[in-house]
Amino acid sequence: MKKPLLLLLVAYALPALAQTHYPTAVADGLEKMAAPCVQAKGSPYFKQALTVADLNIDGLPEYIVDGSRFVCKGAESAINQDGGGTVEIYTGQSDGGARLAFAHAAHGTYLKDDYSYAKAEADIAAGGDPKTAGNLSRLYLIVSGELCRKNSETEPESPCMRPLVWNIEKRQFEFNGVHATIGLSESK
C-alpha cells in the first residue's frame, strides 16, 4: 500500500488524531504503528497509546507512544495481542519538531506525576507559569527478564518497573535501576 493512501486511511480512521498537529516524527511513528491495522481493514485507536509530558524538564513536550495501549478495532488480530508493545519516546524540539530518543519493547508504561519545591522556585524565577511550576513527570516501563535483574534459572518470571532517566550528554532516555515499589496494579 502506498504511503499517501495509508495516510488517507489513517486520517479517515482517526479524525481526532488527524485534527491534532503532532510533529512529523511522532505522526510517522503513529502511522507505522497503525499500518498493519489499516491494512487489515481495522480502525486504529490511539487515545490511550499517546501521552504528552515533559520528561526531561526542558520545558518542551515529550511524546510517549505506548504500543501496549494501541487498539485496532475490528481487526484485533492484526496487532500484537500478548499484552506488550514497543514504547517510543520522542523529545520535543525548540523548532516544534520532535526526534526519537528511546524505543524499547515493554509490557506497558506508568507515568508518575510529582512535584518539586526546588524546581518550582527555579521555574518561577525563570519566568515560568506558577500554575505548572514544579511539576515533574517520571516514566516507568513495565518489563521482565534480564531488565528485572532476575536469574531466569532460579527466580520465576515476573514483571518489574524500571524508571527512565534523561542522559543529557547522549540526548536520549535510558533505564535506571529496578523499581518494584510502585504496584503494577497502578499502571493499568
Spans of features found by a protein language model:
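Positively charged n-region of N-terminal signal peptides that target proteins for export
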Residues: 1-4
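Beta-propeller fold detector
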Residues: 99-106, 175-181
